[in-house]
Amino acid sequence: MEPIEQQLTELRTTLRHHEYLYHVMDAPEIPDAEYDRLMRELRELEAQRPDLITPDSPTQRVGAAPLTAFNQIRHEVPMLSLDNVFDEESFLAFNKRVQDRLKSTENVIWCCELKLDGLAVSILYENGVLVSAATRGDGTTGEDITSNVRTIRAIPLKLHGDNIPARLEVRGEVFLPQAGFEKINEDARRTGGKVFANPRNAAAGSLRQLDPRITAKRPLTFFCYGVGILEGGELPDTHLGRLLQFKAWGLPVSDRVTLCDSPQAVLDFYRNVEKDRPTLGFDIDGVVIKVNSLALQEQLGFVARAPRWAVAFKFPAQEQMTFVRDVEFQVGRTGAITPVARLEPVQVAGVLVSNATLHNADEIEQLGLRIGDKVVIRRAGDVIPQVVNVVLSERPEETRPIVFPTHCPVCGSDVERVEGEAVTRCTGGLICGAQRKESLKHFVSRRAMDVDGMGDKIIDQLVEREYVHTPADLFRLTAGKLTGLDRMGPKSAQNVVNALEKAKATTFARFLYALGIREVGEATAAGLAAYFGTLEALQTATIDELQKVPDVGIVVATHVFNFFAEESNRDVIGQLLAEGVHWPAPVVINVQEIDSPFAGKTVVLTGSLSQMSRDDAKARLAALGAKVAGSVSKKTDLVIAGEAAGSKLAKAQELGITVIDEAEMIRLLGA
């Protein structure tokens, strides 16, 4: 694997993790600014190597998957997100792209609004009556929050006025005013309840309560900003006109909406809002800029995950200066050693900040950072800030260098840094308590073995008390042993035991992902499972054979080969199987016996499909003997191009690979 491929893999893994924490768990770990930085870095790398763009890349999707505690609602019209710009130059470039696509030299009329920092929701009215509401979820499927939305007084249960459409789906943001947020936290501190980090987390946590009575006690509000379904009625042909119509029907709309007839007017609006931001009474993180004309919006269309006619112009993350008092080193699941700066506590955006991640040794070297330095930290509404730069002009005399450990700070094992990698790793494996904790947390996670109720704090205690050393030990736990843990009663303990028993029935792909093999994410695990079919075949595969799996290169193949070559890993797998972990036997597909134009072909999907989901398409293609890959190469036999197909289509045309559209794919699927 080339260095850029490894960078892409690590970036995608990190972004997916933080998308899950942000969109699903409502517990983000990093500021929006840091997420945006990672996303920009990923986009830039993918622009350099478009042939390495994969369908599951965070740049190709909208959000994260919904929880299963709520019923699911499928969005008839996908809830897309917006692309971001961060400075005047980027906005002016966006403005020019719009004018170029419209083939116009005249100024576009923009409708400018506030970018609210809450939770995006969809609300469906039928004949003017509220019938359902859902979160964005992954943009295609969200959570049914109808009962909770009904408790928000700002949202009308019945629209009033004339010419209300038979079916109208409005979209907007549920948020918590700062006064309400402060009262919730004040009450929580007094009663010993949960204190929220910021209004956005409080709004999300309030809206996604399983008990609507709790939601009803929270002072949530709502602003409408768009439309999804529109049937049996009409709306004005401008965005501003639609907002005014929504307001006439009783839907709340922000009064901070302005038409701008030039890029300069947009910039003026942006600056004025930024200046007024502290006095608004609720959190925003930028402004949203939309082409006002619906006809021009239709002409501009969409890319895979966002409209071409709108952009979010984000505010710079808020910054403060403080001192680095010390640097500690944390060890992750794969042994990665991450330096963490311990800061002189400082208030940033209303939150007391005392820690900042420093990523790796290269980051420290690039910053020129020393312990004792005065630094600028940046934070954008969430928890972990970043160190932006060192204030060299105010460097104290008593600073000292940051020395990376030569031995693991947890287990004492040697550390290594592979040439070409930025990460320093502990070599201790499962003898390292830190790696053991993180490996076990990964093993039981929702996308892996999905052990309900087995949270991080339980894993921490199990490792610290030496009840559990390997994943197999989890399945030997009894309710009696679990009852001895903090905050774990007999009923909760039995629920965990039951969840562990249920988790034994899994899939081969989930099992592989749960093992935590380096570089093997969900997509790679699924590819390995589909290609080899059985654990025995995978365990005995050579590095060359592993590379025959779509999207598996030399680096991933080597990690997989080395994992199964390690006797201790094979022993743990044997114990897991002995404890009853199992999955359905593979359905053997003899490609020679399949009468399908896709049999034996390596196929790549690109662009948006309108007749079925991408996952459905992959499943149907695989059932007909195709190998579905994530990137175009000389090994690719066929590319299926949906709407807004981009770099993969261009690469296929460059290589002379056969390309068909979605309609032809559907015809051939039925052949």
UniProtKB/Swiss-Prot annotation:
Residues forming coiled coils: none
Recorded superkingdom: Bacteria
InterPro entries (alphabetical): BRCT_dom, BRCT_dom_sf, DisA/LigA_HHH, DNA_ligase, DNA_ligase_AS, DNA_ligase_CS, DNAligase_adenylation, DNAligase_N
Domain BRCT: 593-671
Residues that bind Zn(2+): 408, 411, 426, 432
Record's keyword annotation contains Zinc: yes
Reactions this protein catalyses: NAD(+) + (deoxyribonucleotide)n-3'-hydroxyl + 5'-phospho-(deoxyribonucleotide)m = (deoxyribonucleotide)n+m + AMP + beta-nicotinamide D-nucleotide
Residues reported in the UniProt entry to bind NAD(+): 32-36, 81-82, 113, 136, 173, 290, 314
Residue numbers annotated as active site: 115
Record-level GO BP terms: DNA repair; DNA replication
Cellular component terms per the entry's GO annotation: cytosol
Gene3D superfamilies: 5' to 3' exonuclease, C-terminal subdomain, 6.20.10.30, BRCT domain, DNA ligase/mRNA capping enzyme, Helix hairpin bin, Nucleic acid-binding proteins
This protein's record includes keyword Magnesium: yes
Keywords for the protein's UniProt record, in alphabetical order: DNA damage, DNA repair, DNA replication, Ligase, Magnesium, Manganese, Metal-binding, NAD, Zinc
Entry EC number(s): 6.5.1.2
UniProt record similarity statement: Belongs to the NAD-dependent DNA ligase family. LigA subfamily.
Function: DNA ligase that catalyzes the formation of phosphodiester linkages between 5'-phosphoryl and 3'-hydroxyl groups in double-stranded DNA using NAD as a coenzyme and as the energy source for the reaction. It is essential for DNA replication and repair of damaged DNA.
HAMAP family per record: DNA_ligase_A
Name of the protein this chain belongs to: DNA ligase
Gene giving rise to this polypeptide: ligA
